[in-house]
């Protein structure tokens, strides 16, 4: 009489073990593209903020801020994004600065708008962040902008353009 319960017990046991195996494999899965995009976005935003802090502390500076000069403004242990670069130019009046900060969106081929979207989300919709598409700057919030991207910024990179002063 108890023998008719045995197949049910085995089936329930097998289903439970299968569910447990699937759960564990999901917990040990490698980072997804979304997680990688968020990580790259956080790295870029930290870099961009460090460049801006350097310029705020050195308002007459123009040129490219050396990586070694950014250490006081980077979070402890923060790594720089791949292909990170910056350029600080004087505004036409000379009273302000235009700060360009950029980085590769992925070490793979092609641009990844996921990094740009994640950076915009991380900064609460900061309109200074966009993606370089040829000579155009594309905001994840506002689309194609009238800003012509300088030739020194590589195509496909994430780009932040901030003006200080006038």
List PLM regions with ranges:
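Extracellular/periplasmic head regions of type IV pilus-like filament subunits
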Residues: 56-123
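Short, surface-exposed interaction loops/tails
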Residues: 106-166
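Generic detector of short, locally flexible boundary/turn motifs and exposed helical patches
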Residues: 10-14, 29, 55, 60-64
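Alpha-helical structural elements
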Residues: 9, 68, 95-97, 132, ...
């Amino acid at each position: 009489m108890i023998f008719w319960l045995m197949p049910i017990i085995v089936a329930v046991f097998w289903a439970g073990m299968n569910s447990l195996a699937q759960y564990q494999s999901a917990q040990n899965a490698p980072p997804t593209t979304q997680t990688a995009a968020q990580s790259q976005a956080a790295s870029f935003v930290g870099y961009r903020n460090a460049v801006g802090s350097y310029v705020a502390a050195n308002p007459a500076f123009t040129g490219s801020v050396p990586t070694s000069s950014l250490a006081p403004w980077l979070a402890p242990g923060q790594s720089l994004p791949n292909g990170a670069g910056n350029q600080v130019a004087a505004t036409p009046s000379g009273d302000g600065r235009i700060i360009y900060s950029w980085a590769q969106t992925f070490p793979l081929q092609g641009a990844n708008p996921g990094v740009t979207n994640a950076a915009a989300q991380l900064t609460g919709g900061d309109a200074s962040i966009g993606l370089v598409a040829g000579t155009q700057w594309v905001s994840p919030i506002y689309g194609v902008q009238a800003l012509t991207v300088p030739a020194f910024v590589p195509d496909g990179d994430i780009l932040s353009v901030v003006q200080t002063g006038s």
